[in-house]
Amino acid sequence: MKTAVAFDFASGDSPENINVNPDRSLTVSLLGVPANKPPKLVQITPSGQRSTLVNGHLGDQITGNTRGSDGTVYYNVDSDGTARNGVWKLPPHGRPERLAALPDGLPNGIAIDPAGRTLYAADSYNSTVWAVPTSGGQAKIWLNGPALAADPHGSLPLGVNGVRFHKGAVWLSNYSQGKLLRIPVTAHGTPGPIHTVADNIPDFDDFAFLNNHSDIVFAAQNDPTDRVTVVRPNGTTQVALTTGDGLASPTTTAISGDKLYIADAGFKAPHDAKLQRATINLHARTGHPRHH
């Protein structure tokens, strides 16, 4: 386990989400709010060089981000300002613009379908996944209900959080219910039945798949659980990384080849905000990261 990038929590650089680009660079959402600073969307090259893509507004949060095949970056903004809350896009060499407004809530994880036509945005306060056309237009409720709601007894009142489109289905994490859900997408684009893959993952923030063909998931479990857990397709889980490996409020994971990236938001003192990198042993049946 290595620190790939060290962040300065006091300047607002608290990483929330990671997307791996084809050139192996990373697009990283930095929250800002925990240190009362504006949020940012940054790109980090494999050599660690950093450039700022978007400077947000003080009080807003940039949460999930994803990428279209043409290089457009799509990201969620959580804002008290109705003119900014919602799903945004940043075209290559363009300027950021809001694609769709969302009602008051907490826009969080975001995913794009393989055809590049539809974005799926989680709303952690409103128990909802919104569908947003990449061509623009009004956000529509794709799925909502109790499976996406928060557990009132959880450490935080957050429901649906992470979103991935994988093998013809939308996969979701429910933060306070501690569940991994799989919802097939029908030929008409509507949600099929909700399948609970695993239900024992407390403080389940976001996740990544081992690769495009595997259903093995690396789940990031935020405070106070503070671990990365491997979830197998049959729902069994195994802890892979803990605070002993340097985890500090892990918010998400991302995978590039045999490299596992973990975003550590550093919410708790000493606020050790960073990106960590581990090597996955792809030949091991556990799919565990190697500790080095």
Which residues make up each language-model segment?
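Blade-level signature of beta-propeller repeat domains, shared across WD40, Kelch, NHL, RCC1
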Residues: 252-292
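Short loop/turn segments immediately following the C-termini of beta-strands
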Residues: 31-33, 78-80, 124-125, 134, ...
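Glycine/small-residue-rich hydrophobic helix-like segments
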Residues: 178-248
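Hydrophobic alpha-helical segments and helix pairs
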Residues: 86-142
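Beta-rich, blade/repeat-based domains predominating
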Residues: 10-25, 29-30, 37-38, 56-84, ...
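A short loop-to-beta-strand structural motif that recurs across blades of beta-propeller domains
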Residues: 39-42, 85-88, 128-131, 179-181, ...
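Short loop/turn segments that connect beta-strands within beta-propeller blades
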Residues: 44-49, 90-95, 133-137, 184-189, ...
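A short beta-strand motif characteristic of beta-propeller blades
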Residues: 2-9, 49-56, 95-101, 138-154, ...
